[in-house]
UniProtKB/Swiss-Prot annotation:
This is Succinate--CoA ligase [ADP-forming] subunit beta. One of its GO terms (cellular component) is cytosol. It catalyses: succinate + ATP + CoA = succinyl-CoA + ADP + phosphate; GTP + succinate + CoA = succinyl-CoA + GDP + phosphate. NCBIfam families: PRK00696.1 (NF001913), sucCoAbeta (TIGR01016). It comes from the Bacteria. Keywords: ATP-binding, Ligase, Magnesium, Metal-binding, Nucleotide-binding, Tricarboxylic acid cycle. GO terms for biological process: succinyl-CoA metabolic process; tricarboxylic acid cycle. Pathway: Carbohydrate metabolism; tricarboxylic acid cycle; succinate from succinyl-CoA (ligase route): step 1/1. Substrate binds at N264, G321, I322, M323. It comes from Burkholderia lata (strain ATCC 17760 / DSM 23089 / LMG 22485 / NCIMB 9086 / R18194 / 383).
Length: 388
């Protein structure tokens, strides 16, 4: 789960991380009121969407008068902001953040992520803040420094000081940087975050260290422990289909293709999409029904996929381990009838009660295209989507 920058800064503030004074605004008049409360002479008007690259897309403006705050708020609020993370369709801006301007001298980058190889938390930092870290990693990997943090000890003073020095924090400002890094780590740890990022971390001309941005992602599996984080959820920033899927415990992600995929298991789902692309097709979605798929879940999965106007065919690819193939077959048959399925349906099933499941499909009277291998299934669904 993602949250907005102003919400991320609220979290940082709770953990002692220095951030600029600022507030969210949901209208132009509210933005002006916030600016007047903060006082001048400089304000930053920022679009609040769940995507990076807002500055390059025109979603961040520096205002030097109240009139400019009004002008920029009017420009940004309601705009369809396109960044490298939104896709070409962009994201509508429904809220702003207005905060006091900062004396920017040195922009740095710091973040915390989970390293699945070492199964520990990694603190990353770079002297190249204020830009896309992916670009830095590609062109100048030597400028990214990493610290492995032992969960049993947390981020040690020496580790924080060492990273701060490596990314260019002046010696006199290292104690401030240490406090920020340790506060960021505590926020990451105590909220069950999967990402906590400050980009940029600013060092002003008088040596003050302050977080000018805040980005958090949270582990959805841990949200039951954090109702205060769930309260930050902004459904306007999420795909309606994905919101609907979550009600039925379906892992669903919309994609740009025209071939629907219904699979059990995330790994098999990704392999299925790769195989479809290998044979020239484009998946319309990632959909993992999990190991406990019921007739209701399969029916809802079909309904979700059929809401996509570009859908041309569906591939059901099931490995029956915990989930029996006859149960999936029952769900496919009931789901197809319930939604009056009107696109070609290719089904491939392997595993527990495979023969029974295949017989149920064959006896259903539905025009289901069967396949024995993943390659055959992908070829058939690509052909069906193309009308062949």
């Amino acid at each position: 789960m993602k949250i907005h920058e102003y919400q991320g800064k609220e979290i940082l503030r709770k953990f002692g991380v220095a951030v600029p004074r600022g507030k969210p605004a949901f209208s132009v008049d509210e933005a002006v009121k916030v600016a007047e409360e903060l006082g001048g002479p400089v304000w930053v008007v920022k679009a609040q969407i769940h995507a990076g690259g807002r500055g390059k897309g025109g979603g961040v403006k520096v205002a030097k008068s109240i009139e400019q705050v009004r002008e920029y708020a009017n420009q940004i609020l309601g705009m369809q902001l396109v960044t490298h993370q939104t896709g070409p369709e962009g994201q509508k801006v429904n809220r702003l953040m207005v905060e006091e301007g900062a004396d920017i001298k040195q922009e740095l980058y710091v973040s915390l992520v989970v390293d699945r190889v070492t199964q520990k938390i990694v603190l990353m930092g770079s002297s190249e803040g204020g830009m896309d870290i992916e670009e830095v990693a590609e062109k100048h990997p030597e400028l990214i420094h990493k610290v492995i943090v032992e969960p049993s000890t947390g981020l040690l003073d020496a580790q924080a000081d060492d990273l701060a020095a490596k990314i260019g924090v002046p010696a006199a400002s290292i104690p401030q940087a240490r406090a920020i890094l340790q506060g960021l780590y505590k926020a990451f740890w105590e909220t069950d975050a999967s990402l906590a990022e400050i980009n940029p971390l600013n060092v002003s001309s008088d040596g003050k260290v302050i977080a000018l941005d805040a980005k958090f992602n949270f582990d959805s599996n841990a949200l039951f422990r954090h109702p205060e984080i769930v309260a930050y959820r902004d459904l306007d920033e999420e795909d309606p289909a994905e919101i609907e899927a979550s009600k039925f415990d379906l892992a669903y992600i919309s994609l740009d293709g025209n071939i629907g995929c219904l699979v059990n298991g995330a790994g098999l789902a990704m392999a299925t999409m790769d195989t479809i692309k290998l044979f020239g097709g484009e998946p319309a979605n990632f959909l993992d029904v999990g190991g406990g798929a019921t007739t209701e879940k399969v029916t809802e999965a079909f309904k979700l996929m059929l809401k996509n106007p570009d859908l041309k065919a569906i591939l059901v690819n099931i490995f029956g381990g915990i989930m029996r193939c006859d149960v999936i077959a029952e769900g496919v048959i009931a789901g197809s009838k319930a939604v009056n399925l009107n696109v070609p349906l290719v089904v491939r099933m392997k595993g527990t009660n495979e023969d029974l499941g295949k017989k149920m499909l064959a006896d259903s009277g539905l025009p289901i295209i069967s396949a024995d291998s993943m390659e055959e299934a992908a070829q058939k669904v690509v052909a069906a989507a193309a009308g062949k």
